[in-house]
Structures are given as C-alpha cells and as structure tokens.
Amino acid sequence: MLDIARGLEYLHTRKPSVIHRDCKSSNILITSRGVAKITDFGLAKVKESTRSMVRSVVGTVNWQAPELWHPHPKYNHKVDVFSCAMVYWEIMQWHNPNKKYPWEGMNEHAIYDAVGAKKQRCVLNHHTIDRLLSYAPLPRPSVSGLRKLWCPEIVDLVERMWQHDPQDRPTMTEVVHELEHLVRRYR
C-alpha cells in the first residue's frame, strides 16, 4: 500500500505534476523484492498549473472517481486518490472470492445515472458476507466488516480517500504520511 501511495505522490508532486488517471490493480506490478511499482502511463496527463482542472473522461470504470461521471467532468489529482482507495479495497478483500466491483454488470448510462445524477456510489456492506458490494446513498460507505480484519486506521483512511467530494479526500502526500506512521506503529 505504501509503495503505491509513494508512487502516486511522486507523480503528483513533480513540476509539472502528473495525474495517472488509470490507477488500478492491473497497473500495479510487484518486483521480485516485493516492491509495488505503478505502470501504464498511457492515460497519464501532465497538469501544467496547480489551479487548472482537466476536462476529459478517462480511466477504467471500476476505479473511476465520481467526478468523472458528469457530462463535462472537471477533475484534478484527487481522481488518483479515489482510484488508489479502490486498489486498497482490493488488497483488503483479496481473501474473498465473492467480491464484486462497484459497477459490475452496469452499462455506462446506468453508471452515469447512479453516480452523476443520483450521487450514489459503491459501499462495503457489513450486513451480508456473500455480497460485499452494494449501492447506497452518500455520504460515507460502511466498512465495518473490514474493521475485524484490518487496523481501523487503514479502514478510516480508505473511507476518506473514497469521499464523493474530491476536496474531502486527502492528498497522496497525506496518505503517505499516514501509512508511514502506521508502519512505524505496527511493526
């Protein structure tokens, strides 16, 4: 988790900065030493200004931030924060063969309606083990089922990274600092 966060932080803090725009598990490779490396920069976008917003839809549906599901999306580095949270969720759910992805089985129109118009999003639902992913209204997903398997600070971090409003998500620098603190605390 920390390697992924450090990789995205590196991209986001360069001058000019880079938004990866397609952070997903299949774009994370693990070296023979167990270090995670981010790959596939085919959709990456150089962001010239810290105040500018990007205006094109890109990425892979299951990892896309809600702000991308609008007719004329405006977004910044926080789309990578949201996607990174989805990768973390996959890591946390690795043991579960029944996990379902947020928009599995939905076409683009249905996704746009759910996320853009109705402001719905994926949530982890602790009421059922067999179906861990369901749809529920904002603002915060329930991740209480994961709290039994993972330290609460990690689950809290993923919840913050998943916020519907990008301004409520941490930066990747903040994510790195929190993960470094947790590594020191739990080692």
Q: What kind of region is each of these model predictions?
A:
Residues 15-30:
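Catalytic-loop of the protein kinase fold
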Residues 163-174:
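A conserved short helix/loop substructure at the end of the activation segment
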Residues 6-18:
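Protein kinase catalytic-loop region centered on the HRD/HxD motif
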Residues 54-68:
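Conserved activation segment of eukaryotic-like protein kinases, specifically the C-terminal portion
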Residues 68-78:
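Conserved end of the kinase activation segment
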